[in-house]
């Protein structure tokens, strides 16, 4: 039975007030005193990390139990930050959330845990969006981590859906939770990013066009037309499975488990 889970949030300086509101929602509505909250603070592209903002993040963490901040001094891809949350958490199951999320359902955490324990699903979206999804360390290593060649943000979710369909024959399942949704605050974004639509970086779109080609016999994922992957993926964190298999041997050594 799964009863331990980590919540991970990616944020940046323009979203500070949203982050504060979200933490208050998590604390008051869900009650996460026994749940680790990993906050990954991203730098803005080609900007210095403001020290006053960094200090405020540390103050937020200091004022609450079980909050673990990871602060990036420069901009990193959303794919890398999602991977980082999953790798750095101490639980197999992880809830990944955006910082512009509204949570008005006090039973959200129980609903998620009940769904996990009744279905055994290791990778699923909530309300059909990657603004909020659940993933395990195990499935991410098996399927392959989010592709960090998408060096900005956007397209990494559609890429993962495509790879899930390729490997398992279907896209990941979805869990519906009422009063739980992304507010889509695209107005609060970094300025030094060339975009193509909805403030999504052009670079990731162009890389997606290299990685996939239109194909009438291809896969329908998040793309409006069927596509086929033409650029190979590779295991970005090859030794994570080795660590997961052997970490109990650090305190009381039995044997090295090779994978």
Where are the predicted features?
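Aromatic-glycine-rich donor-binding/catalytic loop that engages nucleotide-sugar donors
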Residues: 137-154, 163-173
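Acidic donor-binding segment of Leloir-type glycosyltransferases
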Residues: 26-71
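Conserved donor-nucleotide/metal-binding helix-loop-beta segment in metal-dependent transferases, i.e.
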Residues: 106-126
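Short aromatic/hydrophobic "clamp" motif used to bind/position activated sugar donors
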Residues: 94
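C-terminal catalytic/acceptor-binding lobe
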Residues: 21, 158-259
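Cell-envelope/extracellular polymer assembly enzymes that use nucleotide-activated donors
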Residues: 4-6, 36, 159
């Amino acid at each position: 039975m799964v009863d331990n889970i980590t919540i991970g949030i990616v944020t940046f300086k323009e979203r500070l007030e949203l982050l504060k509101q979200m933490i208050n929602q998590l604390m008051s509505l869900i009650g996460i005193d026994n749940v680790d909250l990993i906050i990954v603070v991203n730098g803005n592209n080609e900007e210095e990390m403001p020290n006053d903002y960094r200090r405020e993040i540390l103050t937020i963490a200091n004022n609450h139990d079980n909050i673990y901040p990871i602060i990036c001094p420069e901009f990193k891809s959303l794919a890398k930050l999602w991977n980082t949350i999953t790798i750095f958490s101490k639980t197999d199951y992880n809830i990944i959330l955006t910082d512009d999320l509204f949570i008005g359902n006090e039973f959200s955490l129980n609903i998620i845990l009940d769904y996990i324990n009744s279905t055994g699903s290791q990778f699923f979206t909530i309300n059909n969006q990657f603004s909020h999804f659940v993933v395990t360390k195990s499935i991410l290593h098996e399927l392959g981590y989010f592709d960090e060649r998408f060096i900005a943000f956007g397209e990494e979710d559609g890429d993962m859906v495509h790879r899930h369909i390729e490997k398992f024959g279907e896209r990941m399942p979805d869990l519906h939770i009422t009063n739980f949704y992304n507010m889509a605050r695209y107005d609060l974004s970094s300025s030094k990013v060339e975009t193509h639509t909805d403030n999504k970086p052009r670079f990731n779109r162009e890389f997606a066009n290299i990685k996939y080609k239109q194909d009438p016999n291809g896969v329908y994922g998040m793309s409006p037309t069927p596509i086929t992957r033409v650029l190979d993926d590779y295991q970005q964190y090859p030794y994570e499975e080795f660590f997961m298999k052997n970490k109990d041997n650090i305190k009381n050594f039995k044997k090295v488990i090779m994978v």
